[in-house]
Curated annotation (Swiss-Prot):
Gene for this chain: rbcL
Protein name: Ribulose bisphosphate carboxylase large chain
N6-carboxylysine modified-residue sites: 192
Stored Pfam families: RuBisCO_large, RuBisCO_large_N
Complex formation: Heterohexadecamer of 8 large chains and 8 small chains; disulfide-linked. The disulfide link is formed within the large subunit homodimers.
Positions of the catalytic residues: 166, 285
Protein's organism: Spigelia marilandica
Cofactor: how bound: Binds 1 Mg(2+) ion per subunit.
Keyword NAD in record: no
Classification via Gene3D superfamilies: Ribulose bisphosphate carboxylase, large subunit, C-terminal domain, RuBisCO large subunit, N-terminal domain
Known cofactor(s): Mg(2+)
Function text: RuBisCO catalyzes two reactions: the carboxylation of D-ribulose 1,5-bisphosphate, the primary event in carbon dioxide fixation, as well as the oxidative fragmentation of the pentose substrate in the photorespiration process. Both reactions occur simultaneously and in competition at the same active site.
Other noteworthy facts: The basic functional RuBisCO is composed of a large chain homodimer in a 'head-to-tail' conformation. In form I RuBisCO this homodimer is arranged in a barrel-like tetramer with the small subunits forming a tetrameric 'cap' on each end of the 'barrel'.
Catalytic activity entry: 2 (2R)-3-phosphoglycerate + 2 H(+) = D-ribulose 1,5-bisphosphate + CO2 + H2O; D-ribulose 1,5-bisphosphate + O2 = 2-phosphoglycolate + (2R)-3-phosphoglycerate + 2 H(+)
Length: 416
């Protein structure tokens, strides 16, 4: 006479539904699943769907109070990964109702929150997400986007040039400002705070903001071009971050920056809204990304983090370089670069794009090529990244034999 039978039951009975037709409003995910030996792929795929939506390990009486069919994630397709033994791509569909509108934080909590520690899996990697139009529309997205940025800066038909001020830690604010001035005066469009420059004892944020702004306006007057310096507003609390953003706006600078993974999506979205309301461009650095995306069997691919950023909001984002690496990586990098910029992306597995994604006019993000690049890489970079990009040379500019300004000139000349 018991109402239901308790006990551990197989996930695939409920959560593996190969006959399911995906809806336009579903969020779709592609997971690379490596099951433990002896666990069938359907069970592993279903376990992922369950654990990241409504499931728990047993039947509970409260299940009877909701409509599982309406709210459960479903594993609707599984395919083996060619060339890998016992590894599969599991496709999972999540009903839209499982997610809070306009919250990238909640989306990631739901999809990747728990399931990665799951015992039945040796490893799990989220390869791609398809964000439905209905969900995209609940996000503001990037504060301005590519076209508005070009209009603000009055720079057209070429990539933008930047450089990170080195040595990244240890300069006083005044010398830091001097380095900024030299680079901008020499012909770069932007200079950048390093991602770990926040507000340390040797240079407090306010002093840095003031000296960099002075350098920026001086270079602007002398060159007749609009210049920018990414003032890093990342801080220990959201309130402190906003205080820095407000101060930047009062100084009248064009752009600030944020480390969106260490700072968190919640802080980032708040900042992006502020930037749109106050006409600031927002440059995004991806510090910590390799912790999440480096392993090919476990974690999340960077294209997922990039999609999350476009929803949360940012006008530039770092996207690696591709120069001098393998050909295959090049296609994949190009895949997520286009994913950031274009309004519509076709499914293309060779470029790592598992789903067709329609961004319905959400503004685009400019990819930033940075990390170990210098003048000689320019032709390759422009070929790969095209015009809508920021090419960021760090040590490769400042370490040039005659100092920053000539090297900045060299970068500008090489570009043209």
């Amino acid at each position: 006479s018991v109402g239901f039978k308790a006990g551990v039951k197989e996930y695939k009975l409920t959560y593996y539904t190969p006959e399911y037709e995906t809806k336009d409003t579903d969020i779709l995910a592609a997971f690379r699943v490596t099951p433990q030996p002896g666990v069938p792929p359907e069970e592993a795929g279903a376990a992922v769907a369950a654990e990241s939506s409504t499931g728990t390990w047993t039947t509970v009486w409260t299940d009877g109070l909701t409509s599982l069919d309406r709210y459960k994630g479903r594993c609707y397709h599984i395919e083996p990964v060619p060339g890998e033994e016992d590894q599969y791509i599991a496709y999972v569909a999540y009903p839209l109702d499982l997610f809070e509108e306009g919250s990238v934080t909640n989306m990631f909590t739901s999809i990747v929150g728990n399931v990665f520690g799951f015992k039945a899996l040796r490893a799990l990697r989220l390869e791609d997400l398809r964000i439905p139009v209905a969900y995209v529309k609940t996000f503001q997205g990037p504060p301005h986007g590519i076209q508005v940025e070009r209009d603000k800066l009055n720079k057209y038909g070429r990539p933008l040039l930047g450089c990170t001020i080195k040595p990244k830690l240890g300069l006083s604010a005044k010398n830091y400002g001097r380095a900024v001035y030299e680079c901008l005066r020499g012909g770069l469009d932007f200079t950048k705070d390093d991602e770990n420059v926040n507000s340390q004892p040797f240079m407090r944020w306010r002093d840095r903001f003031l000296f960099c702004t002075e350098a920026l306006f001086k270079a602007q007057v002398e060159t007749g071009e609009i210049k920018g310096h990414y003032l890093n507003a990342t801080a220990g609390t959201c309130e402190e971050m906003m205080k820095r953003a407000v101060f930047a706006r009062e100084l009248g600078v064009p752009i600030i920056m944020h480390d969106y993974l260490t700072g968190g999506f919640t802080a980032n979205t708040t900042l992006a809204h502020y930037c749109r309301d106050n006409g600031l461009l927002l440059h995004i650095h991806r510090a910590m990304h390799a912790v999440i995306d480096r392993q090919k069997n476990h974690g999340m691919h960077f294209r997922v983090l990039a999609k999350g950023l476009r929803m949360s909001g940012g006008d530039h984002i770092h996207a690696g370089t591709v120069v001098g690496k393998l050909e295959g990586e090049r296609d994949i990098t190009l895949g997520f670069v286009d994913l950031l910029r274009d309004d519509f992306i076709e499914k293309d597995r060779s470029r790592g794009i598992y789903f067709t994604q329609d961004w319905v006019s959400l503004p685009g993000v400019i990819p930033v090529a940075s990390g170990g690049i210098h003048v000689x890489h320019m032709p390759a970079l422009t070929e790969i990244f095209g015009d809508d990009s920021v090419l960021q040379x760090g040590g490769g500019t400042l370490x040039x034999p005659w100092g920053n300004a000539p090297x900045a000139v060299a970068n500008r000349v090489a570009l043209x």
